[in-house]
A protein has these predicted regions:
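Active-site/ligand-binding-proximal alpha/beta "capping" segment
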Residues: 163-205, 213-217
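Gly/Ser/Thr-rich beta-alpha loop segments that engage phosphate groups in nucleotides
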Residues: 36, 85, 197-201, 220, ...
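N-terminal positively charged helical leader segments and presequences
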Residues: 1-66
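RNA substrate-binding interface of SAM-dependent RNA methyltransferases
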Residues: 67-165
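Structured adenosyl-cofactor binding patch, chiefly the S-adenosyl-L-methionine
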Residues: 202-242
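Short connector loops at helix/strand junctions that flank enzyme active sites
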Residues: 32, 46, 69-73, 96, ...
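Glycine/charged-rich beta-loop-alpha catalytic/anionic-binding loops adjacent to active sites
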Residues: 15-17, 71-75, 188-190, 208-217
């Protein structure tokens, strides 16, 4: 079934009032007469409408559906990677149910964003998140922040109950699953902090581990986007069991 993201008030109406992007997407879809289209507001509510070809509108809605439980609040702090690899990270994070994505610029990030570029980039990343939510049947849309420098990200770590960081330290830290299992169900929100391809600088790692729990992601070195998906999968599975 095709899905469109709309403003919350659109779901209250008998004839759907679509925002410009959703209306454009609907036109591309070319729905058939009577075809059901699901609208969602990104805040846990969905409603199905039928395409009225004669009037060119979505009407005859079914009852409004509200998600009864919000997913466990997960935050991904991830150093920005190049091009499509970062887009893929956002997409998979949405599919795995994160509540917030914090793009981070650390000393060894290949991607460098001037302050004036960050707003436009964040808008693009939010569109990627919206597309991922629409395609994955997600009903909650995560908050996607503008890219922040590493010191700012450290301050944001304080907003999570507990944050876990992949750390290449000696001796190796405990596996991520074991570390998470020790914290649940006591904490109310979790975060994952993933470094850049070149890893954190020693100073960054020391500062991060004053605020985050060091963990191991396994015996091999993972690429940044792989580490993000692996870590979020572990956290999501652990939260689902707790």
């Amino acid at each position: 079934m095709h899905r469109l993201l709309v403003h919350a008030e659109a779901l209250e109406r008998e004839v759907a009032d679509l925002p410009r992007d959703a209306a454009r997407h609907l036109k591309v879809l070319r729905p058939k007469l009577g075809e059901e289209i699901e609208l969602f507001d990104g805040c846990g509510r969905t409603r199905r409408y039928r395409w009225n070809a004669a009037r060119g509108v979505l009407d005859a809605p079914l009852p409004l559906v509200c998600a009864t439980v919000r997913p466990f609040p997960l935050t991904l702090f991830a150093c920005v990677t190049k091009g499509s690899r970062w887009d893929w990270t956002i997409e998979k994070a949405v599919e795995l149910g994160v509540a917030r994505i914090v793009p981070v610029i650390s000393d060894r990030c290949i991607v460098r964003l001037a302050p004036g570029e960050r707003t436009a980039k964040a808008e693009r990343w939010r569109r990627i998140a919206e597309d991922a939510a629409r395609q994955s049947d997600a009903v909650w849309l995560p908050e996607v922040l503008e890219a922040v420098d590493f010191p700012v990200a450290l301050d944001l770590v304080k907003t999570c109950g507990r944050v876990f960081a992949g750390a290449l330290t000696h001796p190796p830290p405990p596996p991520l699953l074991a570390a998470v299992s020790r914290e649940l169900p006591a904490v109310r929100s979790l975060g994952l902090f993933v470094g850049p391809e070149g890893d954190f600088t020693p100073a960054e790692l020391a500062a991060l581990l004053e605020r985050a729990v060091p963990t191991s992601f396994g015996p091999t070195i993972l690429r940044a986007e792989t580490a993000a998906v692996f870590g979020l999968s572990v956290l999501a599975a652990a939260c689902a069991r707790s």
